[in-house]
Amino acid sequence: MDLVALKFIAIGLAVFGMLGAGLGIANIFSAMLNGIARNPESEGKMKSYVYIGAAMVEIMGLLAFVLAMLLIFAA
């Protein structure tokens, strides 16, 4: 197989990291809304933990994006 073709396959596989980040953030906020619906008094405490968790998941998506950009332009 050509080296350029392998490069584009690797870029396509790196995009799955961004897909995982999107699904992870959706799952986090869905669980938060379910928790607030069950116990509205815990909203303030939940928000801080949810934002920290969402930031960690988003960092993984951004790292996948940076990896894809590095593969496109540097490799």
UniProtKB/Swiss-Prot annotation:
Keywords noted in UniProt: ATP synthesis, Cell inner membrane, Cell membrane, CF(0), Hydrogen ion transport, Ion transport, Lipid-binding, Membrane, Transmembrane, Transmembrane helix, Transport
Chief place of localization: membrane
Membrane topology according to the record: Multi-pass membrane protein
CC per GO annotation: plasma membrane; proton-transporting ATP synthase complex; proton-transporting two-sector ATPase complex, proton-transporting domain
Single Gene Ontology MF annotation: lipid binding
InterPro entries: ATP_synth_csu_bac/chlpt (IPR005953), ATP_synth_F0_csu (IPR000454), ATP_synth_F0_csu_DDCD_BS (IPR020537), ATP_synth_F0_csu_sf (IPR038662), ATPase_proteolipid_c-like_dom (IPR002379), F/V-ATP_Csub_sf (IPR035921)
Residues annotated as transmembrane: 8-28, 52-72
Record localization: Cell inner membrane
Annotated site residues (Reversibly protonated during proton transport) in this chain: E58
HAMAP family given in the database record: ATP_synth_c_bact
NCBIfam families reported in the protein's UniProt record: ATP_synt_c, PRK07558.1
Subunit structure comment from the entry: F-type ATPases have 2 components, F(1) - the catalytic core - and F(0) - the membrane proton channel. F(1) has five subunits: alpha(3), beta(3), gamma(1), delta(1), epsilon(1). F(0) has three main subunits: a(1), b(2) and c(10-14). The alpha and beta chains form an alternating ring which encloses part of the gamma chain. F(1) is attached to F(0) by a central stalk formed by the gamma and epsilon chains, while a peripheral stalk is formed by the delta and b chains.
Role summary: F(1)F(0) ATP synthase produces ATP from ADP in the presence of a proton or sodium gradient. F-type ATPases consist of two structural domains, F(1) containing the extramembraneous catalytic core and F(0) containing the membrane proton channel, linked together by a central stalk and a peripheral stalk. During catalysis, ATP synthesis in the catalytic domain of F(1) is coupled via a rotary mechanism of the central stalk subunits to proton translocation. Key component of the F(0) channel; it plays a direct role in translocation across the membrane. A homomeric c-ring of between 10-14 subunits forms the central stalk rotor element with the F(1) delta and epsilon subunits.
Family recorded in the similarity comment: Belongs to the ATPase C chain family.
PANTHER family tied to this protein: ATP SYNTHASE LIPID-BINDING PROTEIN, MITOCHONDRIAL (PTHR10031), ATPASE PROTEIN 9 (PTHR10031:SF0)
Name of the molecule in the record: ATP synthase subunit c
Source organism of this protein record: Wolbachia sp. subsp. Drosophila simulans (strain wRi)
Lineage: Bacteria, Pseudomonadati, Pseudomonadota, Alphaproteobacteria, Rickettsiales
